[in-house]
Each structure stands twice: as structure tokens, then as C-alpha cells.
Regions:
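Sec/Tat signal peptide C-region and signal peptidase I cleavage site
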Residues: 30-33
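Short alpha-helical segments used as structural interaction elements across diverse proteins
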Residues: 10-11, 28, 224
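Bacterial N-terminal signal peptides that target proteins for export
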Residues: 2-17
């Protein structure tokens, strides 16, 4: 065999060895990545609830439930300014079986969509609308819609102020408890779940403390709120809970 042929054969052999090494390393890396990746979250059943903490006499609870099915004196639900079919286009919105806002709209025979589409409720940031649902349509006695404004300008920081609006309206209405649904995922907004839930919690507590301060100065009177239930979908319950617990802890330091 000529020297040239031998060198060529040796180059091919070394090349094959290199390829095999790369394949071996790749397989090993994939195994390590699989071992180190976060475990898949366990499926959380609808109806699951957990008390995440208590602040100033208010029990703050998480619940896997949609806003049309939660038993509460006041149900708070959030909506953006209307865009055609916004809660029904999946993706980005959650599919109808998992979309609490779709269920709420259906429970009220399409009236949520109707009042948004016709501009009767524009959904501008902090705009509110109080609805008394007909008997048997949903479990809450009252429904409060809070506007989130332009979806393209959404920031998680907004939810602190939205939480404040929710608590202030609850105190005005004199309810003992209320449930809150941000409905961001329902509307197709890929928001940071823990941060949003934590910000809502902060706003709720801050608003309550402000009113308590005014009451102590004899500048306000109100019936205490003793329970706030933050709703979450099955896939977001645990993550939301972490944000809620962190927010509660920040008021105890």
C-alpha cells in the first residue's frame, strides 16, 4: 500500500473515531440534562384549595377554579380593552375547556363579550363595572370587572394597583370575602405567574392597611374582609402560590 493511501485511510479512521466520540458525548449530555431538568408538575385537580397565609386577619387562599364557579360574595375578574375574539383565539388564549373567562362569558350568555365589544365597558385600566348575575348563572353574588387597559402595554407592576382597586371596591360593598381572577392567561398574555400573583396580593394588603389606618384616625369605617381567594388554573396553581407566599412574607418582615 502506498504512503498516500495509508495516510488517507488513517485520516478516515480518525474521523470516524471523532464522530463516535461526539455522538457519545451528546448522548451523555442529553442524559445529564434530562436528569437535571425540572420535574413535570403534578396535575392539580379542579377544586383544590390551599391557605397560603394570613395577614392582618385576612386569610389568603389559593383555589383551582374558574370565576364562574367559585363560591364567594364577590367575584373579581380582569379584562383588557376589547380586540375581536381575544378570549376565544387559542393560542395565544387558553383553550376553551381551560379558559375561565370563556366560561364566565358563557354563564352570562355572552354578555361579557357584548358589553366589551359595544364599548359599554371599554376595559380601560382601572375602569370598573359591577354586575349582579341572575340567580343560577354563577356562584358569586356579585361580579366586579376591572379593566387592564391596552394588552400591548401590560406590565406585571400594574397588578399591584389592580389588587388595590379590588380590595377598595370590596370594602365599599361591605363583603366579608371575595375571589380574584386576573384572567391574563385566558386573554393570551404570557405573564410571569408568580410575580403577577404576588403583586395582586401586595396590592390587596396595601389597600386594606390604608383603610385600616384611616379607620384608626376616624376617617373611615368598614366591615372587615376576612378571606381573599386567588383563583388559578391547574397548571399555574403551585407557581402562583409561591408568589403569594413571598408577598405575604414581605409584610411580616
Amino acid at each position: 500500500m502506498s504512503t498516500h493511501a495509508f495516510q488517507k485511510k488513517d485520516e478516515i479512521r480518525r474521523g470516524l473515531i471523532g464522530v463516535l466520540l461526539l455522538v457519545s458525548i451528546g448522548l451523555h449530555t442529553n442524559r445529564v440534562d434530562a436528569q437535571q431538568s425540572d420535574p413535570q408538575p403534578k396535575a392539580i385537580a379542579v377544586g383544590t384549595s390551599k391557605v397560603w397565609g394570613k395577614v392582618d386577619g385576612i386569610v389568603i387562599e389559593g383555589l383551582v377554579q374558574g370565576p364562574s364557579s367559585a363560591s364567594t360574595e364577590l367575584q373579581v375578574a380582569c379584562v383588557f380593552e376589547y380586540t375581536e375574539g381575544d378570549i376565544f383565539k387559542s393560542p395565544p388564549a387558553l383553550p376553551p375547556p381551560l379558559n375561565g373567562m370563556v366560561h364566565l362569558d358563557e354563564a352570562l350568555k355572552g354578555q361579557i363579550t357584548e358589553i366589551r365589544k359595544t364599548g359599554k365597558f371599554a376595559g380601560h385600566a382601572f375602569e370598573i363595572l359591577l354586575i349582579t348575575p341572575p340567580a343560577g348563572t354563577m356562584k358569586a353574588r356579585k361580579l366586579l370587572l376591572i379593566g387592564l387597559g391596552d394588552r400591548d402595554k401590560f406590565s406585571p407592576d400594574l397588578m399591584i394597583s389592580i389588587g388595590k382597586v379590588a380590595m377598595r371596591e370590596a370594602l365599599i360593598l361591605g363583603v366579608n370575602n371575595f375571589a380574584f381572577a386576573s384572567d391574563l392567561k385566558d386573554a393570551g398574555i404570557d405573564s410571569p405567574t408568580a410575580l403577577v400573583a404576588g403583586n395582586v396580593t401586595k396590592g390587596i394588603i396595601e389597600a386594606y392597611r390604608t383603610q385600616a389606618y384611616l379607620k384608626a384616625k376616624k376617617l373611615s369605617s368598614f366591615k372587615p374582609v376576612t378571606r381573599v381567594t386567588l383563583l388559578a388554573g391547574p397548571a399555574f396553581f403551585s407557581t402562583a402560590g409561591e408568589g403569594i407566599k413571598n408577598a405575604i412574607a414581605s409584610f411580616k418582615n
